[in-house]
Amino acid sequence: MEFWGLEVKPGSTVKCEPGYGFVLHLSQAALGESKKSDNALMYVKIDDQKLAIGTLSVDKNPHIQFDLIFDKEFELSHTSKTTSVFFTGYKVEQPFEEDEMDLDSEDEDEELNVPAVKENGKADEKKQKSQEKAVAAPSKSSPDSKKSKDDDDSDEDETDDSDEDETDDSDEGLSPEEGDDDSSDEDDTSDDEEEDTPTPKKPEVGKKRAAESSVLKTPLSDKKAKVATPSSQKTGGKKGAAVHVATPHPAKGKTIVNNDKSVKSPKSAPKSGVPCKSCSKSFISETAPQAHSKAKHGGK
């Protein structure tokens, strides 16, 4: 840095040149001694432009500070006719364009490098986090997935087994009952047909009426006995006893009320059935063979 200053006399113009490789900084202007109150308007001319930079007065502003920089030749002048004006400042070496380019490039590199480092750091952090998650996810999911698969397989096996067992049980439970129902229905229908179709041979009126009255009375008692007695008592029937049959309680047979005193309760009937003396048929109640013999064998 180099100090600089000059005097501009009244009515004159002074040329100033910063010099090669320097810039001139205009710092201050002061009004010289004057016996009269005088004002001085200062000008600077650069190329073809003339600009006013300030006004000095003995009473109010004897000096003014500036902050003007010039990098090429310029001219200073003022309007005072009685006193001179003094300008002061300093010169500074001007940085070359190459140096400026280097400085600018360095600044740009620094500005670019800082965000790049941040972005790279963020990217690295993101990559690390993603890798950690990717490593943690399979390790956590592998045992859970295996357990879930095993549980699903076991549940499916259990459901399949339970469904098969239920279907088997239902088939086994229904088949004997259906068979028993069919057999009991066939027995009932065959007995009813045999008992309800009497064929008397003798023309005797008294016996015929007695036979008809007995035939009409006995089927009702037989039917009541058949309804009251459980299917488990038909062990001496035509088709034999059924296996594992769900039957009503045998106690219900006790609640049957019959006004006919001649008809006995099913308890007196033997388990093997009452056989007919004339043929090989057997009946559950004791009165059924009598009606059968009267209807089929003519009361023998």
From Swiss-Prot:
Keywords assigned: Chromatin regulator, Hydrolase, Metal-binding, Nucleus, Phosphoprotein, Repressor, Transcription, Transcription regulation, Zinc, Zinc-finger
Transcription regulation keyword on record: yes
Annotated disulfide bonds: none
GO molecular function: hydrolase activity; zinc ion binding
Main location: nucleus
Subunit structure: Multimer. Possibly forms a homotrimer with HDT1 and/or HDT2.
Protein name according to UniProt: Histone deacetylase HDT3
Organism, scientific name: Zea mays
